[in-house]
């Protein structure tokens, strides 16, 4: 057991609050982004960064939804979640799900984040039978897109 001083505890609390606030700001900025042909909305720097990664563009089309509530039963328990970004293509019978993460060192909570996106996929597959539902984590520190199976 370590002996933490009050100062250590306050510094830890300040760091957590800073990280939470930064994550909230990043999520808000990402919610505003649309890149669909000539239609471009949102923070210019973020849009420019996203455009460097062509694999991200299908997530930022005009019909993309943000902060999408989803709920259902998983392993006998009621689960309610909110999806950061979702694109539904009824013609292709496909749904793309993206969850933003602001961690610079993703290893610490990677399994938790992966499980979170897997829950989204399970809930959506029950709601949209016959659709292919694909999930991804977007690491905002380097705009790396990670597929979740």
Which residues make up each language-model segment?
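Mg2+/Mn2+-dependent nuclease catalytic core
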Residues: 77-149
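Nuclease catalytic cores
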Residues: 1-83, 89-90, 114-115, 122, ...
């Amino acid at each position: 057991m370590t002996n933490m001083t009050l100062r250590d505890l306050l510094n830890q609390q300040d760091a957590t609050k800073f990280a939470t606030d930064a994550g909230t700001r990043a999520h808000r900025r990402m919610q505003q982004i649309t890149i669909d042909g000539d239609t471009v909305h949102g923070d210019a720097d973020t849009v420019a960064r996203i455009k460097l990664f062509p694999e991200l563009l299908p997530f930022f089309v005009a019909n993309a939804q943000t902060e999408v509530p989803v709920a259902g039963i998983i392993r006998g328990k009621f689960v309610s979640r909110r999806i950061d970004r979702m694109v539904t293509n009824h013609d292709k019978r496909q749904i793309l799900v993206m969850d933003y993460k602001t961690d610079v060192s993703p290893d610490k909570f990677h399994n938790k984040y992966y499980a979170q996106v897997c829950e989204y996929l399970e809930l959506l597959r029950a709601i949209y039978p016959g659709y292919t539902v694909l999930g991804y984590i977007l690491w905002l520190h380097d705009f790396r897109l990670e597929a979740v199976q």
